[in-house]
């Protein structure tokens, strides 16, 4: 806690030096709120990098990147600088989702294939997608950490610190989780990367995909983007061969019914609709 104008405000101690680098009077720190680190040198450098990219103040990003502190949770964690994040090969891939399988279920083999390399961060568009991904991972005996604003302040802050200090974690969260300083992070997965929910509503309007691309390069992380089709931005990167496009071959059965006498739907189509309804929802596109 430091004095700023006529009030006290929170700050982050980023370094300690023997002598000041600037002339003039310096204000003293009023109070140390916590001895538990909430950021690493690397994560603060990355926030500065993203701030430069979006031409904004780093604090505009810190409010998204670091959850509010809860004093009672700090007592459960030992003070000390978290280990540097290890990184991976830095490859970037777009995995096209198959049409006949639930999207969240298709992340399970991706996680299994990359788990040995280190911790994995999965960023999903919204709370519903996060819960579906977590349920799929738990169905194969994995224990992911949830990191979203829908958690209570205590749960969110606790999980944030667990992600910083735990080893080989699987963290699943919404867009703010892209900044989380996860220990031994090796792989980042941006699920449904073209979703509008990956865009921050507050200034400077950053989005998960762009921040993930910056982080992949900054930390040499493996980055996997998923979706049924790539966004325009990712399509350009695929054309430029900066992103590898991966998909599986799928066969789709197509039936054509010729309308008769101006009917909106041909009579013969209703038998197929009834059969399809026994399996799942039916979508009509006019």
Where are these regions (language model features)?
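Accessory, non-ATPase domains that flank or precede helicase/AAA+ motor cores in DNA-metabolism machines
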Residues: 1-286
